[in-house]
Regions:
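Flexible, compositionally biased loop and terminal segments
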Residues: 1-176
Length: 176
């Protein structure tokens, strides 16, 4: 079981809003932001799809959730982070600068979701202004899919190993 929290999607979200960040990746043939063209982004989307296809083909069940909040809800959450001392650590002044780029981020999210949703790795867009409701929706999706895995069970011991369990216990008790 694993959880990717944004991770490889940062490569087609934050870096599209701030292409100058890509220069710090020291990629071949990218020496300035002018080198970052549409083909560059299409390659990144393809790489994400290839990675997720590999995971799916090797038995990984992929769930991708976009926790969509409104701009007003984001404002309220930022205010809570500032007002509640226990949440202060979540705030950065940079959040205010990034908030000014809301529309650009929304366009990038939409593009990334459209270009990386596949049969083996679909996106679920979760309305998330209400945290509890959003969590319930995510849990119900997970439950619905995972209920299909009724044959999950621990592996069976080979008969010879099972027949000798007491022998192995005795050996370990001797201190070997």
């Amino acid at each position: 079981f694993g959880v990717f929290n944004r991770t490889h999607y940062e490569n087609v979200l934050v870096t599209r809003v701030h292409p100058e960040y890509i220069l710090g990746e020291y990629l071949p043939d990218i020496t300035s932001t002018e080198d970052i063209d549409d083909a560059f982004w299409e390659r990144r989307f393809r790489q994400i799809n290839d990675f997720e296809r590999h995971l799916a083909e090797t038995g990984t069940q992929i769930f991708k959730f976009f926790m969509h909040i409104s701009k007003e809800e984001q404002r309220q959450r930022l205010l809570r982070r500032l007002r509640l001392p226990r949440k202060n650590w979540k705030f950065s002044p940079a959040d205010l600068d990034e908030r000014e780029l809301w529309d650009t981020y929304q366009e990038c999210y939409q593009d990334a979701i459209q270009k990386t949703t596949t049969d083996h790795a679909p996106w679920y867009i979760i309305p998330s202004d209400n945290k509890e409701g959003a969590r319930l929706i995510v849990a119900s999706i997970l439950l619905q899919v995972l209920e299909g895995f009724r044959d999950i069970r621990e592996p069976e011991l080979e008969p010879e190993v099972k027949a000798n369990l007491n022998k192995y216990i005795k050996e370990l008790k001797k201190g070997k």
